[in-house]
């Protein structure tokens, strides 16, 4: 959600040493819209009772805007974030990256501080694609410097224009260098989240397979086209692969749910819950009447610990209406969403020209039509199987382990063994947290745009 935050420009405050405009923007935005506002003492309304005490409070952070933001977050919050450049934030929400095209996962080598990276998939037409880098490739170092828990962010930063990676391979219980290196160059790329869509025909079943890596509104037409193909092909079963999908726009999740079904148009898909002072903004999201309707009464979702936010909304929102079978790992457990909060200076959408900060704080909780939203520990998979870095397989091929397990669960492939039907592989290498933020956001209701104007900074 893009949110209009109205700063009080006539009442800009100062510590006497520097202007506190950004700090004021951060505090006011969280005070008004943060989901856990009433449980954070420093976000209490009485912080506004005295301009002097308020200014003294803000100035103690010494212009460290991230520190102020983080100090105002609830212990329950794993997902809010702030950026100094709102253009970068907008690009991130639209899956526009400065990248070589390698979409990677980091993992720890044994019990050491050393890390290695393995390639999950490669973006088409990227530099990595032209250098023949493929899913399953491993590397230990960047620019001949070993990846560690302390340096990986710097070495893999989007600010780095070009770099080299040194390939590695699994050797017993560790990772060993191969001596091969490749140079890569980054470019700005918008990822098409529809990574694969194809028809799988097995044992008289016509199965639509969609690997979908982000709920991005820019590609809604392409998503509809993919489902139109499924409908024309007469698919009677559906697999939605969300293993790498960290979320995105709520409106796209509603559109996808509506195309998967079609028989529930106008019924409640999800319900939002805001903080107490914004409870009037709680609303129901309804299934849409889409042109493409597969009318499924059961779907299979490939999931992982990186399946988050709008992905979980899709699963949870559909569950009261159809059977949703999860194959893979339990999901992230992000049952909350956010608005993009900017420092607007008027009703026309003009932003404060004196800074470029913007926030993506948690502002709402979202439940399904039955009011269920309590899955902070993730939605549990029905058939558990972790990706094995030593046996990743080729995405979209029926012998790729997670897709194969899904086809077994559907009954169109015989199970390889009884034991494997509910089996969780013990990983040899500990995965590190994802490099991408889990995101669920939506557009601004018009009635929210003027809320802050009546809550000006009080004077002594």
Where are these regions (language model features)?
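C-terminal "post-core" interaction segments
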Residues: 209-210, 218-225, 229-230, 237, ...
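Active-site-proximal loop/turn and secondary-structure-junction residues that shape catalytic pockets
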Residues: 188, 244-246
